[in-house]
A protein has these predicted regions:
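Catalytic cores of nucleotide-sugar-dependent glycosyltransferases that transfer UDP/GDP/TDP-activated
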Residues: 1-251
Length: 251
């Protein structure tokens, strides 16, 4: 609702929309909490919930690592990306810093199809880093559920994103989103603040690869060096309500 009042996003209607901004309110989409429920999901390796994810979620990571041919190690920082592979999704930012992103501690699992340049980009990196990158150039709902349950973090560096659903699903599975502050991503992900231990994800403002990598590295620091704070952030994310009932109530 705020972005469409700007010249960049307003498509010529920004003046009218700005004049009537008091009449507008953005309402985000919802997700099906029955379909996306780690406690009952039959598509994941091991079920879990907010009370026991500390002891059970990692099993999903190890099993997915084994299935995809990655190095099996629960201590690896697994980042998931489930997306249409298009310019909108910020994939050029990933390309610019990929060699720094997938260090010895990090794995990236990609699921999606789209523009050939990005499909081939991820295929190349999977060839270059076979133990660290898994490029699944397809869409498999079963595999997507497994990744939501297995990953530690979920990357969405979108150029623009009117709402977005995958960050909501990742919250549901205790997977921490790393997003660019645009559209619905800004509305749904509250940036982590280490000073008051608040927030439920990580975000960066500018469409800039180095800024994105800096935030990813910061998230890894919290994951490895401040595990209690990380788990508390997961708790807050899983407690969010992005069901359709919540969206209906706001409407």
């Amino acid at each position: 609702a705020q972005e469409i009042q700007t010249e960049y996003y307003g498509e010529g209607l920004n003046g009218l929309l700005s004049a009537r901004h008091f009449d507008m309110q953005g309402i985000v989409n919802g997700i099906d909490y029955t379909t996306y429920n780690p406690q009952t999901d039959s598509k994941i390796y091991m079920n879990y919930d907010a009370s026991n994810f500390r002891k059970k979620k990692y099993v999903n990571k190890e099993r997915l690592q084994e299935e995809l041919g990655l190095e099996v190690d629960k201590k690896k920082y697994m980042i998931g990306l489930i997306s249409r592979l298009t310019d909108q999704k910020g994939l050029d930012l990933i390309n610019a810093v990929m060699d720094g992103l997938v260090d010895e501690f990090t794995q990236l699992v990609v699921i999606g199809t789209g523009e050939p340049q990005y499909e081939n980009m991820f295929r190349h990196y999977a060839w270059k880093y076979p133990n660290r990158v898994s490029a699944n150039i397809c869409y498999s709902d079963d595999l997507a559920h497994k990744l939501y349950a297995a990953a530690d973090a979920f990357l969405m560096p979108s150029r623009f994103e009117p709402c977005g659903l995958t960050q909501m699903i990742s919250f549901r599975y205790g997977t921490v989103p790393i997003v660019r502050e645009t559209g619905g991503l800004k509305d749904t992900v509250q940036a982590y603040n280490e000073y008051d231990n608040s927030g439920d994800g990580f975000s960066f403002t500018n469409y800039n690869a180095d800024e994105m990598l800096q935030v990813i590295n910061y998230s890894k620091h919290i994951f490895y060096d401040r595990k209690r704070q990380w788990n508390q952030m997961v708790d807050r994310g899983m407690a969010n309500d992005f069901s359709w009932n919540a969206s209906k109530f706001r409407y």
